[in-house]
């Protein structure tokens, strides 16, 4: 009985295929075209893997988006991961960390409070990190944190009065690396240290005014907030390039060569929570429109896993161990800088001087407020 039934079904499908072969061919071509286009828009993937057991990696922006994918990758490779959070972890974050430890079979995943938009929070964390004898191990710093405000939103400032995007995208990471410099320099000569920082193509639009870094005295570009992000990314890339050069010029007590490698990774346009906030204009109706256009976003843009491939490449590829120049990675390949200011030492010195002055002013104002509160 089963054999005649199977024969009947096979014959029916065969006849149906012959009758409607044109429709099936068109459908197959359409599906293949969409799949090929999606494969192209997803970008390149890295094939490198790396054993990171025993390594200590510090990650900013590791609680969502690309940073979250990077944290999971590092944990799966066996690294001890320190995730820097803006606030004390809530129950959701605690559950996520516990689940991540279970999935990756790695118990060495921790969180620390370090709000990159607050210079005082960064100083408190970084000072605590370096206040240790012997020097704490630190193999890698991955800077994934970033803020991009939606268009037509008013200027947002931190509690310390600094423009939010400038503080989070540049001034906070700058403060962190500036204070952690002794720890980075103090690592054993045989230990390779990497700094991997997120950037984006908006750095090409950067136009930094050293007398007004966060545009506090200029009209805020409500229609194009990415210009502020462009300033921050240009500043960060310039500082990282200078940071690497000064590390190479630093003479170690053991006379060994510099083993620091700085890589800036451009993930491209990725469907992250930050992107969703920007294209939805931070509104409920915008979010509804974003959901309606989801097939369009899915087809054209990368997911977080594909967006993180350049980070995976920067973390795992052995080619960077032999490169002494700070490099920019896009689609898992080293590319040239589009702004000559990044490699200009005079531009870097002006930037560092202005950033130091801004941080000093922020900390000075905080001390004044603290004294006033204590007198009340």
Swiss-Prot record:
| Residues involved in NADP(+) binding | 66, 115, 178, 233, 270, 272
Keywords associated with the record: Cytoplasm, Endoplasmic reticulum, Membrane, NADP, Oxidoreductase, Transmembrane, Transmembrane helix
Protein function: May be involved in lipid metabolism.
- Organism equals Schizosaccharomyces pombe (strain 972 / ATCC 24843)
Q: Name one GO cellular component term.
A: nuclear membrane
**Domain of life assignment:** Eukaryota
Assigned EC number: 1.-.-.-
User: Where can this protein be found?
Assistant: Cytoplasm; Endoplasmic reticulum membrane
Transmembrane stretches, start-end: 281-301
Family statement: Belongs to the short-chain dehydrogenases/reductases (SDR) family.
Which stretches of this protein does UniProt put in the Lumenal compartment? 1-280
Membrane topology of the entry: Single-pass membrane protein
For the keyword NADP, the answer is yes
**Pfam families recorded for this chain?**
adh_short
| Annotated active site | 233 (lowers pka of active site tyr)
Supply the InterPro entries for this chain: NAD(P)-bd_dom_sf, SDR_fam
Enzyme superclass (EC): oxidoreductase
* Cytoplasmic topological domain residue ranges: 302-376
In its UniProt entry, what is this protein called? Uncharacterized oxidoreductase pbr1
One GO MF term attached to the UniProt entry:
oxidoreductase activity
């Amino acid at each position: 009985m089963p054999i005649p039934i199977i024969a009947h079904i096979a014959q029916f499908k065969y006849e149906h295929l012959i009758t409607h072969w044109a429709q099936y061919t068109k459908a197959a071509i359409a599906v293949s075209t969409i799949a090929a286009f999606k494969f192209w828009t997803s970008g390149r993937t890295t094939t490198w893997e790396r054993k990171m057991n025993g390594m200590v990696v510090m990650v900013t922006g590791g609680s969502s988006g690309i940073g979250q994918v990077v944290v999971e990758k590092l944990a799966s490779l066996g690294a001890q991961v320190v995730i820097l959070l803006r606030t004390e972890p809530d129950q959701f974050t605690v559950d996520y960390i516990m689940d991540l430890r279970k999935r990756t079979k790695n118990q060495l995943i921790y969180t620390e409070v370090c709000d990159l938009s607050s210079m005082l929070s960064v100083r408190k964390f970084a000072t605590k990190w370096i206040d240790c004898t012997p020097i704490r191990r630190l193999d890698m710093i991955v800077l994934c944190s970033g803020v991009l405000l939606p268009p037509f939103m008013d200027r947002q400032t931190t509690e310390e009065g600094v423009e939010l995007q400038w503080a989070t995208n540049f001034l906070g990471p700058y403060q962190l690396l500036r204070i952690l410099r002794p720890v980075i320099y103090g690592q054993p000569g045989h230990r390779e240290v990497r700094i991997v920082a997120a950037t984006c193509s908006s750095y090409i639009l950067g136009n930094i005014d050293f007398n007004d870094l966060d545009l506090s005295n200029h009209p805020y570009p409500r229609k194009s907030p990415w210009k502020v992000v462009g300033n921050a990314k240009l500043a960060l890339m310039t500082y990282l390039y200078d940071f690497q050069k000064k590390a190479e010029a630093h003479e170690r007590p053991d006379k060994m060569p510099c083993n620091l490698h700085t890589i800036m990774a451009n993930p491209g346009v990725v469907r992250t929570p930050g992107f969703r906030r920007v294209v939805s204009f931070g509104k409920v109706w915008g979010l509804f429109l974003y959901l309606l256009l989801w097939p369009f976003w899915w087809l054209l843009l990368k997911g977080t896993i594909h967006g993180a491939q350049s980070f995976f490449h920067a973390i795992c590829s052995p080619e960077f161990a032999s490169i002494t120049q700070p490099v920019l990675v896009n689609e898992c390949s080293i590319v040239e800088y589009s702004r000559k200011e990044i490699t200009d030492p005079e531009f870097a010195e002006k930037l560092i001087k202005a950033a130091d002055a801004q941080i000093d002013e922020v900390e000075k104002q905080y001390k004044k407020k603290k004294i006033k509160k204590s007198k009340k």
